[in-house]
């Protein structure tokens, strides 16, 4: 039985955690958007890079903890990250991947077995899906879950702090909320800094460079009612944007909205 530093224990394979069931479904090609699945378990964004670029990317994440909070990292060439889950294989356990060459998206496979190399390092970055459980528990509605679509995500004019070849704008996710719910959401998500924490912006999307909120750069659009405000959180798709801008010769990421579901518990991420 594996124990990770917070003291949480993973169940044995026979007991089959809901998170492990999701990963098995991914291996079988039967999974899609992970919003709302395996309640209680931490989800993560994925970035896989050659070892040559790993140190600079790690530094980028350290300098930009809001969009890029690292929750796990593999050894060089090892597709498993035991601290994140039982029998977890980073090559097969997400619903869909993106493969990049020289900054260009070339493929979106359901596994990356054929692309795996001995020099690759995998980074798992915290995902806002993890704090959504806490919002729902406080009766704060989440539009993309209600509509069973991917959360809308946007590139902004908020610059990230550069590191090595990695630089570019922050990507944000958006959830429309009534003002009272937005205030409560700030309070709730502030407790979860390892999965983006409090919002980075509320209202006035044009002021952070979003020209048309009805057309997200990633994910799916959701309606905003007249009595609602768009609330924006730093997003773990930011690494995809900076990896593409850096034109790294080879990289693998998750497809936006289709995350790695780990065996870590959301409740263990709260700082208060």
Curated annotation (Swiss-Prot):
Top-level taxon of origin: Bacteria
Keyword Lyase included in the entry's annotation: yes
Pfam families the record matches: D-Glu_cyclase (PF07286)
Gene3D superfamilies hit by this protein: PSTPO5379-like, PSTPO5379-like domain
A GO MF label: lyase activity
Entry EC no(s): 4.2.1.-
Keywords: Lyase
Similarity comment text for this entry: Belongs to the D-glutamate cyclase family.
Name of the protein this chain belongs to: Putative hydro-lyase RPD_1846
Organism per entry: Rhodopseudomonas palustris (strain BisB5)
């Amino acid at each position: 039985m594996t124990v990770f530093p917070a003291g949480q224990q993973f169940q044995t394979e026979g007991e089959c955690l809901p998170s492990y069931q999701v990963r098995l479904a991914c291996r079988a090609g039967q999974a899609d958007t992970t919003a709302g699945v395996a309640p209680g378990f931490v989800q993560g964004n994925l970035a896989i890079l050659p070892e040559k670029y790993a140190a600079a990317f790690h530094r980028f994440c350290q300098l930009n903890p809001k969009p890029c909070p690292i929750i796990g990292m593999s050894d060089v060439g090892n597709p498993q990250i035991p601290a994140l889950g039982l029998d977890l294989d980073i090559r097969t356990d997400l619903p869909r991947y993106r493969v990049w060459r020289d900054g260009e998206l070339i493929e979106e496979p359901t596994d990356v077995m054929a692309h795996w190399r001995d020099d690759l390092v995998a980074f798992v970055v915290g995902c806002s899906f993890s704090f959504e459980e806490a919002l729902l528990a406080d009766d704060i509605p989440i539009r993309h879950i209600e509509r069973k679509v991917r959360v809308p995500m946007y590139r902004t004019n908020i610059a990230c702090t550069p590191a090595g070849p990695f630089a570019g704008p922050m990507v944000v996710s958006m959830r429309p909320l009534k003002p009272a719910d937005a205030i409560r959401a700030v309070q709730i998500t502030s407790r979860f800094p390892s999965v983006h924490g409090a919002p980075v912006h509320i209202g006035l999307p044009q002021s952070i460079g979003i020209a048309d909120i009805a057309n997200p750069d990633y994910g799916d659009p959701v309606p905003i009612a007249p009595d609602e405000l768009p609330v924006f959180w730093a997003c773990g798709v930011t690494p995809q944007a900076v990896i593409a801008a850096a034109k790294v010769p080879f990289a693998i990421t998750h497809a936006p909205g289709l995350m790695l579901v780990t065996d870590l518990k959301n409740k263990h991420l709260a700082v208060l």
